[in-house]
A protein has these predicted regions:
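Active-site-proximal substrate-binding groove within the catalytic cores of carbohydrate-active enzymes
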Residues: 266, 270, 485-679, 689-691, ...
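An acidic-aromatic substrate-binding cleft motif
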Residues: 288-332, 336-340, 344, 348
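N-terminal export leaders
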Residues: 16-23
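Polysaccharide-binding surfaces and accessory modules of carbohydrate-active proteins
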Residues: 46-242, 673-678
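Aromatic- and carboxylate-enriched substrate-binding clefts and catalytic-loop regions
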Residues: 340-548
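Beta-strand-rich recognition/accessory modules
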Residues: 49-53, 121-123, 202-301, 566
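C-terminal beta-strand-rich structural cap/linker in extracellular carbohydrate-active enzymes
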Residues: 682-709
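N-terminal secretory signal peptides
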Residues: 1-14, 27-31, 40
């Protein structure tokens, strides 16, 4: 992990706690080579063709230790210097291969597998390179790599970083698409086609003061398949996953930009990185990553049933709401079928103190208890909005507990731009204790049944150099964020085992390492319906059957009414409608027509909430590999539930055939659920097709012919 060591030692399986210790130790240069963090069962004969991997993915090494990737026996890339040490004097890419060894793996978490270790030397640079390639039978097409560089010379080497799994895919008809798990401050799409000038660094470090982190996977794919790269460490690591359109195709890699001095005899050890080959879009490699990390001990909790209930949020009334406005809307929200009522931003005096605003709740705690009681009286569940780790200028906590602040190496603050607030350190125990007590009070005393944790700064933080915190390493804040969320999650569930903890890191690419502390992810301020759907497909791959993904307020979607982009992909529906009228004190001009529930909107809302509650597709099996979200037209999503299969197609306009993929053999009755129209019977087994004409969406259900829907 950009570690420096002086010996070769096989290590036991690495868990989160061990990794934290090693990262702390690496600053002083004491981390050992860990090319074999999985249990070896025996030594094996190396492959005579210089390849490592399995029948789906194999990586070949030539005499210079350049590599080539094969998928199912066919070359996917050319020979390329995929692993390189980056020096101030230039990149070291050529190493004379001197040794190859092989081992059989029998790991208690990942099962049987194999490992090959390739060793080479660069005489010119005075560097030895050792590359470990591990694969497991349960994960065909996925390889885990780790590289060790040793300074064999007599003078220090000024290292500027390293690069692994650097490959170019040649151009092909239709071009390329890419998924990026890294956060960008401009909240760009996670899934994009690669234009001629496409060039993204995809850093997992901070992109700006309050935007950073993400899921450590990126990929590129053509119509015939693609490559994914990333890392499999149990804690966040500040690596880059650059993707670029080139003159000949598209390139991808994993890189570390961290500079260090490598003394004679010392070693640099990289993070454990992944390389995967796949067909179709990004769903398959993300799902492989999710399964692998589950074996490493990182997985989401199984959320309570209430995490799938429709959500009404009072944010339509904004911060300057009146409690009476919320109370007046509850009967309508319940009538339409919404189960949650979210008290959003504005109940508090400021971000930081989290004291009740007595202008809205004059009796303080008593009024908050009365609020939750009123929500329950209408047969709904109350949820409370919070934005932890932010302290507003002028707040008491900023004055009385300035020690909580996260500081950079110059002693400067990290800012949260949305609230013009300052970031608090999640790895400082007084900070943790403060927010744990706040959550316990909100759920255990006030009676809220869920917490909405909101803000882009919640996804990742910068290294903390505050001397008051006595961190073993500045990276403690980075790796400690997931621990902070675990403490919040435990506090909420200790107070109410059925509580729902929602994490909404606005506009960011969700940090996978925060997953164990999250019952529900929304699409987090989507900029379009495309973001609702493409984020949803990503999250369903990363959480799997434990998924509660919400489409966020439908008013953020195209035309401010696109429930189809949530319902059709199995996302929880949400709305911030107002009723019987809009706020008369908006902070910004309302959109045309506002958010008020007109008669026309009410009819549409009622229809979609009814369809959602009737079919409850978030509890179905999302069939993410059936369609390629980039290349298949129209865009399609499929879900299997209770013996039926659901298909939703999306396009501005479509007039042609649609394919119903994945139908088992037999006769299937197809129904247009939104328009309540039977479309006939198709044969399963092969790919069934239907003629279709629609605008925006087509929402279909296929049931065995002769059965009741």
């Amino acid at each position: 992990m950009l570690a420096i060591s002086t010996g070769l030692t096989l290590m036991p399986p690495i868990g989160r706690r061990t990794a934290l210790k090693l990262i702390a130790g690496s600053v002083a240069g004491s981390m050992a080579w860990s090319a074999a963090p999985w249990v070896r069962a025996a030594t094996a004969a190396p492959a005579p063709d210089g390849r490592a991997g399995d029948a789906v993915l194999s990586i070949g090494f030539d005499k210079r230790m350049h590599t080539r990737v094969w998928r199912r026996g066919k070359p996917l890339t050319g020979w390329q210097p995929s692993e390189a040490l980056l020096l101030a004097s230039g990149d070291v890419t050529d190493f004379a291969l001197v040794e190859q060894t092989a081992h059989v793996l029998d790991d208690p978490r990942h099962g049987a597998g194999r490992q090959a270790v390739f060793t080479g030397r660069s005489r010119a640079a005075g560097v030895e390179k050792q590359v470990s390639v591990s694969s497991f039978d349960a994960q065909p097409g996925l390889a885990l790599l780790q590289v060790r560089y040793r300074n064999l010379g007599d003078v220090p080497l000024e290292v500027t970083g390293w690069r692994s799994s650097a490959y170019q895919l040649d151009d092909a008809p239709g071009g390329f698409w890419s998924f990026s798990g890294a956060t960008h401050t401009d909240r760009r799409d996670w899934v994009q086609p690669l234009a001629a000038d496409f060039d993204q660094r995809n850093t997992l470090a901070m992109d700006s003061s309050d935007y950073g982190g993400g899921t450590p996977v990126a990929n590129i794919w053509r119509r015939d398949g693609g490559l994914a790269v990333g890392h499999v460490e149990p804690v966040p690591r500040p690596l880059d996953m650059p993707v670029k359109r080139t003159a000949r195709g598209a390139s991808i890699a994993v890189e570390s930009p961290k500079a260090l001095t490598l003394a004679p005899g010392q070693e640099l050890v990289t993070e454990r990185t992944l390389l995967a080959v796949h067909e179709g879009d990004f769903y398959a490699p993300l799902q492989q990553y999710q399964v692998f990390m589950r074996g490493e001990g990182i997985e989401g909790p199984r959320p309570p049933d209430s995490a799938f209930a429709p959500i009404w949020c009072a944010w339509g009334y904004e911060r300057d709401f009146r409690v009476e406005q919320i109370y007046a809307t509850l009967p309508k929200a319940k009538e339409l079928g919404f189960e949650w009522a979210v008290l959003d931003d504005g109940w508090q005096t400021n971000e930081g103190d989290w004291k009740i605003d007595r202008r809205k709740f004059p009796r303080g705690d008593a009024d908050m208890r009365a609020f939750t009681a009123e929500v329950r009286r209408h047969g709904m569940r109350p949820r409370l909005w919070l934005a932890p780790l932010a302290a507003d200028p002028g707040s008491d906590v900023l004055h009385d507990h300035v020690d909580m602040l996260l500081l950079d190496k110059e002693g400067a603050f990290q800012t949260v731009t949305w609230w013009n607030a300052l970031t608090q350190c999640p790895a400082y125990q007084p900070t943790i204790d403060f927010y744990v007590e706040l959550v316990k009070k909100a759920i255990g005393d006030w009676g809220f049944e869920g917490i909405k944790l909101d803000g882009q700064h919640l996804n990742a933080v910068a290294p903390c150099h505050n001397p008051a915190h006595k961190h073993a390493s500045p990276e403690d804040s980075v790796t400690g964020l997931a621990t902070f969320w675990n403490a919040i999650y435990r506090a909420a569930h200790d107070a109410n085992p059925e509580a729902v903890v929602e994490l909404c890191p606005c506009g960011t690419a969700f940090a996978f390492h925060n997953l164990p502390a999250t019952d529900q992810f929304p699409s987090s301020d989507p900029l379009s319906s495309w973001q609702v759907r493409s984020k949803g497909k990503s999250i369903k791959a990363l959480i799997g059957e434990r998924s509660s993904y919400a489409g966020d307020h439908v008013e953020l979607s195209d035309n401010r009414d696109d429930f189809a982009s949530s319902v059709g992909i199995g996302a929880v529906i949400s709305s911030k409608f107002t009723w019987p009228k809009d706020t008369d004190r908006p902070s910004v001009p309302l959109p045309p027509g506002g958010f008020v529930l007109t008669d026309e909107r009410e009819a549409l809302w009622r229809r979609w909430v009814g369809l959602y509650n009737t079919h409850m597709l978030p509890k179905g099996e999302y069939l993410g590999t059936l369609y390629d979200i980039g290349f298949d037209k129209p865009e399609a999503h499929a879900i299997r539930k209770d013996g039926a299969q659901y298909y939703t197609f999306y396009a501005p306009r479509w007039d042609g055939k649609v394919e119903l993929r994945g139908l088992p053999a037999g006769r299937w009755q197809v129904r247009d659920l939104f328009n309540e129209t039977d479309l006939g019977v198709v044969d399963g087994g092969a790919v069934a097709t239907l003629p279709a004409r629609f605008e925006r969406f087509l929402f279909l259900q296929a049931t065995p012919a002769g059965s009741a829907a």
